[in-house]
Structures are given as C-alpha cells and as structure tokens.
Amino acid sequence: MKQLFAAILCLCLLAGCGRTDSTGNTCRAEESSGDGDVPGKTEETGADAGGELFRIIRSQDGAAPLLLAKESGGPGDVYTLSPTTVEPTLDGRSTAAMDLVYTPGTLLEITYGSVLETYPGQLAEVTAVNIRSDGFDDRCALYLRVLNDLWAVDEGLNSDITMLSVDLSQTGLSDSEQAAVAWAFGGEHGISQVLSLNYEQLAAEGYLTGADPDSDGMPCWEDGCLFTITEQETGDNELNGARNTVTFDAQKWRSALGAYFFTDCTASRDAQGHWGDYTVGAAAIS
C-alpha cells in the first residue's frame, strides 16, 4: 500500500511540473491594430529580460513618459516608460544629486518584469533604469523634424487625411526605430491610423485608387498621405546614414498631381552623436 501511495504521489507531481504557465511570453498589440490600452492584461517577460537596451525616441520636456524603441528590435518593439519610484543610474552611478533630462537619442538599460498589452507596450515592474553615456544617436529626432516640416508645407495635401503611411525603409533606422518615429509623427497630428507601407505596398493592399496599370484614372490616396525619407547611397552601395553626414530625399505624396519634395538634403552629427539642423538642396511640387 505504501508503495502504491508513493507511485500515485509521484504521478501527481509530474503532472504539475508538466503544466505551462500561460504568462510566459511578452505580449504587445500588433502594430497595425491601432488599438489603445487593453486594461488589466500583462504578461511576464521572464527573469532573463532584465538589462535590455532601448533608445529614447521622444520625451515630454525631457521627462517621462518616454517613447522607446528596443535596440535592433522589430516593428512591434515600441514601448513607453512611465515615471517610476526607481532611481535611475548613470553608467551605474547614483544620480541622486543630478538634475536629469531624458534626451531623445539616449540609450537606456532597463530591467523590468512585464509589459502591459498595449501599443506601444508599457514597460511595467521596472526595477532598474541605467542611463548610458555611450551610443547616443538622435537621428530619429532629425527625421521627425523633417516629417513635421514636410507636413507644414503645402498643408492642403494633408489637411483632411484620416490615415498616413511613413516609409523609412530606405534609411539606416532599425525596424523598431522606424515604427516609433511613424507612431510619434501620427500622434503629433492626431492621426491614429498609421502605416509603414511604401507606394507599391499601398497600391497592392487597395489603399490607392487609379493605381492599377489597366486603370484610366490617376493614382491617388483619397483618405491618406504617404511620407517617405530615402537616404542616398554611398559609392560602396551603403546607405550613408551610418556615417557622420547623411544625404537624403524626403517627400509627401497624395496623388500623381499632389506631392511635395525635399531633395538633396544634408545633415551632420558631432562627435557625441547629435545630429544638427539639415539643409534642403531644392524643393519641388507636383
């Protein structure tokens, strides 16, 4: 009888060990959903998720909440960090006596326990925030300025849109940085439906009218506007954004007869990674 009882107990323990915890994965809303917060839902990231690197894309007057892009992340790796009771460190040293400013372009090393299921995802259960003095690069802030300048010129092209697409695929930004810039740009102008598609993809997915080769009409996006930044290639066939000077073209497109262009734009960064103002070689309208 004792042997039978012991065998039953072992089977019960094995059954318990075989269960998979349903909170074992990081959850985030899909980029294309456009949904806001999904209250009350979190998923654990796992103990090994601590100390991950994120780049600040946008801050509110140098303070939290921060919009972050996970370093070398995918389109869904866009997050926010709200004020916490955790005292940040600077390269591992205390910042108690410092007047901290969170500057876009700065790298943060963040240890956290879970992510709220929203888009952008909200980092939660944060136990450590380490501000890195190395790796600074605020090219995302540069391209946000370019996009906002494009928005402001010939504003009739985008004054009545309900959606937009931002194509940064031909820049040196990571997928997560591209998605974060697009989301921030749309939010600044009250556009909740933000895509990251190029012209061909918009046409293929049916957003454009008159784009079919057999159509007699003129290509047009009736409800939206496409914003594109394209870095020019260097002689070795690499995008020159990886260097200290970048040359690029930028445009917004509503239709074949409704577009605005910045061409041969140039910008440079200093030794600390700060990108300065850019110059426009020429502007054109169609």
Please describe what each predicted stretch is.
Residues 13-16:
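C-terminal motif of bacterial Sec signal peptides marking the signal peptidase cleavage site
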Residues 1-8:
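Positively charged n-region of N-terminal signal peptides that target proteins for export
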Residues 113-119:
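Short, charged beta-turn/beta-strand-edge "cap" motif at the junction between a beta-strand
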Residues 95-102:
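Short, surface-exposed secondary-structure edge patches
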Residues 18, 24, 28-35, 40-44, ...:
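Flexible low-complexity loop/turn motifs enriched in small/helix-breaking residues
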Residues 262-286:
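Short beta-strand edge/turn micro-motifs at domain boundaries
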